Swiss-Prot record:
Residues recorded with modification Sulfotyrosine: 320-321
Originating species: Mus musculus
One example of a Gene Ontology biological process annotation: positive regulation of cell adhesion
Motif (Integrin-binding motif): 293-295
Residue spans of biased composition, Acidic residues class: 66-105, 155-179, 203-213
Protein name as it appears in the record: Integrin-binding sialoprotein
Biological role: Binds tightly to hydroxyapatite. Appears to form an integral part of the mineralized matrix. Probably important to cell-matrix interaction. Promotes adhesion and migration of various cells via the alpha-V/beta-3 integrin receptor (ITGAV:ITGB3).
PANTHER family named among the record's database cross-references: BONE SIALOPROTEIN 2 (PTHR10345:SF0)
Gene this protein is translated from: Ibsp
Superkingdom classification of source: Eukaryota
Region (Disordered): 60-228, 243-263
Amino acid sequence: MKTALILLSILGMACAFSMKNFHRRIKAEDSEENGVFKYRPRYFLYKHAYFYPPLKRFPVQGGSDSSEENGDGDSSEEEGEEEETSNEEENNEDSEGNEDQEAEAENSTLSTLSGVTASYGAETTPQAQTFELAALQLPKKAGDAESRAPKVKESDEEEEEEEEEEENENEEAEVDENELAVNGTSTNSTEVDGGNGSSGGDNGEEAEAEEASVTEAGAEGTTGGRELTSVGTQTAVLLNGFQQTTPPPEAYGTTSPPIRKSSTVEYGGEYEQTGNEYNNEYEVYDNENGEPRGDTYRAYEDEYSYYKGHGYEGYEGQNYYYHQ
């Protein structure tokens, strides 16, 4: 008897837990709070009387209402075929006319739409199925948009090609202007008239005379610096129409300081030595007598100075954690 009672109690507990699990119905979107054993009836009839919300069912044409009432399934199918043929014919028309027709068709369909929703107990007949799918058939001229898309792409490509051609022409014109400007500033131009009405050839002769006088002056010079200046001006090359007029640094007699000499001795008073002393400005206190924050400059400096003198294999990894 005792064993029978024990078995019955175990079976009763199992049934109770199973029924609780059946009523609980944990869903995937439920949180962990809903996992507690609670008696919550789910109102299955109220929630699952129908699986989808009521769909709005629009008639495709005005005659579809009469066909549905009369039960002529063949007539509705014939109307669908006629619509397909008419859509194919309309796809062959021009894009401008199609846009106007689309607007008119949408207005007419919206005006003829009725807010009739079929009852849920109605039988699912073929005309009812076509009637339910009428909402998907409202955008009739989808093919028109597809036919217009390649035309728009072609026009965009033509515009891009025209823009590229214009940019290339502008670049060529700028290059020609730059070449003309360079030729105008150089002394080798023989076609440009001078300011006093003299020809470009006269200007070239004057430039040659000036160069000869410069070479004579360079030969008469005594010091090495002056010789360098004359040679520098004589051998100055016209780079992009501009003449180099800056003489070399040896012309002024300036000597660069020796390379290996320490600069701190020479320029000791000119520069302020910073970085060696610690500034208290970096420490930010919440209160006047409070402790500094964790992100102070001192903390970063200590961490960096610890790593600064050692390589990665120069210290044991444990010492760093023990010293913290």
